[in-house]
C-alpha cells in the first residue's frame, strides 16, 4: 500500500509539473497566499498597484546570510514607498526563528512557503525543480515579473530596477 501511495504521489507531482513553464520577465506573477511570522496574511493579487519584491531564501544558504544585510538597506530606502518586500522560505517557524534572532530581517518572513516555491521555481526537461538561493522576483504594479535573478550580489540591480519603476509612475 505504501508503494502505491508513493507511486500516485509521484505521478501527481510529475503530471502537474509537466505543464509548468519557466517564469520569465514579462510573465504574470503567479498568485499566492502566505502568512508571515507576525500573523499577517499576504495575497499577491491584493498587492496590485504596489511593487513587490519576493526573496526566496534558506537558513542554510551562506549567500543568503551575506545578502540579507544588503537587502535590509534596500528595504529601508523604500519604507515610505509603495514597495512590499517578502522573504519566503520552505522552512518552518521553529527552524526560522532562532536564525532570525541572530540575523534579523527588516521585512516580512513567510515560512512554510513550499507551495509558492513550486509556483516560482524553474523545471528542467527531466522534471527536476530548480531555484538558486537567494532568488529574487521583482513584480511591477500590474502583477508582471520585471526581474528574475538569483545568487550573489544582486541587491544593487534590484535597487536600480525599483528606482526605475518608481520614476516611471
Task: Describe the role of every protein-language-model region.
Residues 5-15:
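Bacterial N-terminal signal peptides
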Residues 18-44:
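N-terminal "domain-start" segment that seeds a small globular fold
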Residues 29, 165-169:
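Non-globular targeting/processing and membrane-anchoring segments
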Residues 43-62:
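Short active-site neighborhood of thiol/selenol oxidoreductases, capturing the structured segment around
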Residues 53-54, 85, 136:
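Hydrophobic beta-strand anchors of alpha/beta hydrolase catalytic cores
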Residues 65-105, 116-124:
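Structural microenvironment flanking redox-active thiols in thiol-disulfide oxidoreductases
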Residues 102-105, 112-163:
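Thiol/disulfide oxidoreductase modules built on the thioredoxin-like
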